[in-house]
């Protein structure tokens, strides 16, 4: 769930979106300026979409400034032309800008119209968002993907897990995934997290040894958390999130599974996904660590302070509290109205 920043499109940009959706525009560049989404640049089609792609997209990717690009394909769906949504966040741009653009990404798609967007890409270097990068993305998403013998074996393991007979004894063990053992250093780190002598743990899979290894336990605060997320490798993270909620000081353990998409091999994606549930079971049962929230991300810039708070304390909780003492309607009817408990099935008289 993407955190919303309160930034919205200007009326001029909304009008341009409407014009572009009709098919007269090949590319739209959107930037954040004065806390608003504004039109940065646009281009009309010259040739086929694949002929226009690199010459339209690549020159608009600034080495220092993030941006959003909407690129029109030649294919159509029921709503009209299909578009690619490209999120550009270069390595050299300031962390504050990266976080702002990551948190506003969902708003841009909503303002443009999510039904028009066929696919989306995220890039930190130009190769990520080039035509070759897009084709690589399509290849990685294609099903069935080409598998090595080891990957086919892993796939068969997962299929067999699905087919496991569900009985009273086995139903809680079905689909629990692969269990790579935690190395001693990783176990010690989890014990330290339970004792609150460390506040951050990063773990990785050793694919050759089939173990879960400790990467580091560097002290980390919320502001530093995005920088802990590798851009080119998957990781498991445990973070002791210290914050205040409704006047109470809390320390909540948050699990973060970071997977930077197609930058990882199919085997790596499958193994990290398959090992995750068994790792969490071990952490909660063997180490008696209560995990307040489990989050999956593709980019560290998503981990803003507000995003973490909203994940641990979803806003719907506030609505429940608001309805705890509803105001009765005016007039005599207000004195007769009852709020029934969850076990009562009577009807209003």
Curated annotation (Swiss-Prot):
Disruption phenotype: Mice lacking isoform 1 develop normally to adulthood, are fertile, and do not exhibit obvious morphological or behavioral abnormalities.
GO molecular function terms noted in the UniProt entry: actin monomer binding; ATP binding; phosphatidylinositol-4,5-bisphosphate binding; protein kinase C binding
Presence of keyword DNA-binding: no
Keyword Lipid biosynthesis: no
Disordered: annotated segments: 322-349
Modified how: Phosphorylated on both serine/threonine and tyrosine.
Modification sites for Phosphoserine: 349
PROSITE patterns from the UniProt entry: ADF_H
Subcellular locations according to the entry: Cytoplasm, Cytoskeleton; Cytoplasm, Perinuclear region; Cell projection, Stereocilium
GO CC terms in record: cytoplasm; cytoskeleton; cytosol; filopodium; growth cone; lamellipodium; myofibril; perinuclear region of cytoplasm
InterPro entries: ADF-H, ADF-H/Gelsolin-like_dom_sf, Twinfilin
BP GO annotations: barbed-end actin filament capping; cell projection organization; cellular response to growth factor stimulus; cellular response to retinoic acid; intracellular signal transduction; negative regulation of actin filament polymerization; positive regulation of axon extension; positive regulation of lamellipodium assembly
Database matches in SMART domains: ADF (SM00102)
SUPFAM superfamilies: Actin depolymerizing proteins (SSF55753)
Feature: compositional bias, Basic residues: 330-339
Modified residues (N6-acetyllysine): 14
ADF-H domain location: 4-139, 177-313
Pfam families linked to this entry: Cofilin_ADF
Keywords, ordered alphabetically: Acetylation, Actin-binding, Cell projection, Cilium biogenesis/degradation, Cytoplasm, Cytoskeleton, Developmental protein, Phosphoprotein, Repeat
Modified residues (Phosphotyrosine): 309
N-acetylalanine carried by residues: 2
Expressed in which tissues: Isoform 1 is ubiquitously expressed (at protein level). Isoform 2 expression is restricted to heart and skeletal muscle where it is the predominant form.
Protein family membership: Belongs to the actin-binding proteins ADF family. Twinfilin subfamily.
Function: Actin-binding protein involved in motile and morphological processes. Inhibits actin polymerization, likely by sequestering G-actin. By capping the barbed ends of filaments, it also regulates motility. Seems to play an important role in clathrin-mediated endocytosis and distribution of endocytic organelles. May play a role in regulating the mature length of the middle and short rows of stereocilia.
Protein name: Twinfilin-2
Gene: Twf2
């Amino acid at each position: 769930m993407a955190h919303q920043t309160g930034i919205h499109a200007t009326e001029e940009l909304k009008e341009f979106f409407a014009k572009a959706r009709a098919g007269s525009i090949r590319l739209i560049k959107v930037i954040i300026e004065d806390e608003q989404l504004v039109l940065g640049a646009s281009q009309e089609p010259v040739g086929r979409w694949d002929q226009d792609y690199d010459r339209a997209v690549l020159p608009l990717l600034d080495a220092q400034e993030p941006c959003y690009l909407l690129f029109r394909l030649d294919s159509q769906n029921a709503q009209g032309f299909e578009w690619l949504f490209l999120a550009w966040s270069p390595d050299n741009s300031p962390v504050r800008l990266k976080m702002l653009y990551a948190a506003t990404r969902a708003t841009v798609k909503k303002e443009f119209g999510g039904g028009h967007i066929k696919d989306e890409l995220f890039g930190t270097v130009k190769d990520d968002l080039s035509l070759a990068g897009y084709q690589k993305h399509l290849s990685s998403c294609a099903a069935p993907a080409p598998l090595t013998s080891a990957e086919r074996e892993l796939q068969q393991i997962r299929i067999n897990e699905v087919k496991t007979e569900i009985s009273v004894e086995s139903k809680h063990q079905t689909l629990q995934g692969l269990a790579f053992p935690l190395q001693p250093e990783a176990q010690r780190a989890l014990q330290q997290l339970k004792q609150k002598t460390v506040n951050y743990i990063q773990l990785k899979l050793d694919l050759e040894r089939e173990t879960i290894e400790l990467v580091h336990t560097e002290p980390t605060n919320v502001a530093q958390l995005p920088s802990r997320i590798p851009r080119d490798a998957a990781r498991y993270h445990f973070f002791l999130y210290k914050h205040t909620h409704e006047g109470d000081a809390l320390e909540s353990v948050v699990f973060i599974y970071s997977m930077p998409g197609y930058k990882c091999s199919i085997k790596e994606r499958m193994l990290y996904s398959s090992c995750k549930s068994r790792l969490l079971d071990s952490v909660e049962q063997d180490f008696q660590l209560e995990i307040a929230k489990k989050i999956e991300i593709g980019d560290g810039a998503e981990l803003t302070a507000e995003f973490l708070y909203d994940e641990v304390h979803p806003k719907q909780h506030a609505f429940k509290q608001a309805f705890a003492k509803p105001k009765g309607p005016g007039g005599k009817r207000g004195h007769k109205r009852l709020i029934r408990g969850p076990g009562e099935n009577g009807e209003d008289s």
